[in-house]
């Protein structure tokens, strides 16, 4: 894990497998000189925050309610917890066959006066890169969705292939979110969310005055902080007012959430930028990804430029072949969709459109995240400004100490079917669980 990977080599490799990796240039860091922190991420199942506070947690609920850190009781138990939960039981009613209980993350951190740099490596469960997401397939008459995540009933029944992107996610706080330093990402995970107990989807969410059609225009429930509900333990729908939530945000009571998405951001050298408050929100501006599809008519907007990548569409047998394109990038490998181009039954196009040029605002802050997959291992080098200057990001400073939590979505899964870490401290030139070493 400690081999040196220069940014130049990493970019060149990423270009070879996924089209142009266009991330902003990073400074050369001698990663062989930076200590490696080995972190075990484990499978959490349906262990929501409500479960942590319930008697089912077997006296752990009393300690959680008292604010004691998870690591006080569970340090060194990550492997045992993950291996137990992934097999199925009360906290995992729908286990996925062949899924591993843990992922070993090797993390290094450095900083200079302007940026934080992270280098992450981990092995994947599958023998291919998870760069497939929201694909559509032509059946001879029309374009239809093709592929789902591994928990989807259509995949479990064999009606659809398992096609979903891998992700590496970082949560970050500066001490302003209650209990994140002690309980980590569990403060964001609640009953009612997708793939949890009593999940709320459809009309019940659309009719909600804050989350639904009259507010955020959402149709499901995603991560949120307890501070945005009317009282401790309140259900997902018992939200405070928009004005009250805005005050929490203005006071810094949100979590920074950044995600490197192998399908939706990696090919343009970026990661998305979001935050968790009353919902899992994206930062202001425009992401590096959008839709490559009119979802009402199921008509693609762009196709591959055959003159540049050799094909105008993929076939099922192309998926997972590194030499084949996987992402449609507006400014580099795409041309407008031509409905009269002689499409054949089985032609496949990505339903997402990537563009580095179109990414704007705070949503585009993570503009230099280079990643590659080789021989079953991802290597990601991430650069982030210490202070982005945006009010939906956490501002860092040299000498500061912060709380971080990591998650990895591996093997074509989404939502809670990931691996997570307990909360850790990150020091920018300061002693911590993870110390970002000063580079000149």
Each PLM stretch: what is its role?
Residues 105-108, 367-373:
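Beta-strand-rich interaction surfaces with strong enrichment in secreted/lumenal proteins
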Residues 1-9:
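Bacterial N-terminal signal peptides that target proteins for export
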Residues 8-18:
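Bacterial N-terminal signal peptides
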Residues 365, 372, 380-388:
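A beta-strand/beta-hairpin structural motif
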Residues 24-67, 81-108, 131:
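Sequence context of c-type cytochrome heme-c attachment sites
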Residues 67-77, 189:
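The canonical Cys-X-X-Cys-His
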Residues 115-122, 378-384:
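Short, well-ordered beta-strand segments enriched in hydrophobic/aromatic residues
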Residues 24-53, 138-344, 389-440:
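Acidic/polar low-complexity flexible segments
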């Amino acid at each position: 894990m400690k081999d040196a990977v220069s940014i130049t080599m990493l970019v060149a490799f990423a270009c070879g497998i996924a089209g142009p990796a266009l991330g902003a240039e990073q400074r050369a860091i001698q990663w062989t000189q930076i200590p490696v922190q080995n972190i075990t991420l484990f499978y959490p199942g349906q262990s929501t925050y409500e479960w942590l506070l319930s008697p089912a947690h077997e006296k752990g609920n009393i300690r959680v309610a008292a604010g004691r850190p998870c690591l006080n009781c569970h340090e060194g138990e990550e492997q045992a917890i993950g291996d137990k939960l992934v097999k199925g039981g009360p906290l995992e009613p729908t286990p996925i066959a062949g899924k591993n209980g843990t992922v070993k993350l090797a993390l290094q951190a450095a900083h200079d006066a302007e940026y934080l740099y992270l280098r992450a490596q981990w092995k994947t469960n599958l023998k291919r890169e998870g760069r497939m997401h929201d694909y559509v397939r032509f059946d001879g008459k029309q374009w239809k969705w093709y592929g789902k995540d591994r928990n989807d009933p259509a995949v479990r029944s064999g009606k659809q292939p398992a096609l979903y992107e891998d992700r590496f996610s970082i949560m970050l706080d500066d001490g302003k979110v209650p209990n994140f330093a002690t309980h980590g990402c569990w403060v964001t995970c609640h009953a009612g969310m997708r793939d949890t107990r009593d999940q709320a989807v459809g009309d019940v969410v659309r009719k909600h005055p804050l989350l639904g059609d009259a507010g955020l225009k959402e149709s499901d429930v995603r991560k949120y902080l307890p501070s945005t509900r009317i009282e401790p333990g309140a259900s997902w729908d018992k939200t405070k007012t928009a004005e009250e939530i805005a005050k929490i945000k203005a006071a810094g009571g949100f979590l920074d959430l950044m995600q490197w998405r192998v399908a939706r951001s990696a090919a343009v050298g970026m990661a998305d930028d979001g935050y968790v408050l009353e919902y899992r929100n994206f930062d202001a501006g425009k992401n590096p990804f959008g839709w490559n599809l009119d979802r009402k008519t199921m008509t693609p907007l762009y196709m591959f430029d055959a003159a540049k990548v050799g094909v105008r569409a993929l076939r099922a047998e192309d998926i997972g072949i590194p030499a084949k394109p996987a992402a449609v990038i507006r400014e580099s490998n795409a041309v407008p969709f031509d409905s009269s181009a002689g499409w054949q039954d089985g032609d496949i196009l990505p339903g997402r459109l990537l563009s580095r040029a179109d990414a704007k605002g705070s949503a585009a802050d993570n503009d230099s995240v280079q990643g590659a997959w080789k021989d079953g291992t991802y290597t990601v080098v991430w650069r982030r400004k210490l202070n982005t200057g945006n009010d939906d990001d956490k501002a860092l400073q040299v000498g500061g100490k912060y709380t971080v939590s990591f998650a990895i979505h591996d093997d074509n899964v989404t939502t809670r079917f990931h691996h997570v870490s307990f909360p850790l401290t990150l020091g920018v030139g300061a002693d911590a669980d993870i110390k970002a070493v000063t580079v000149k």
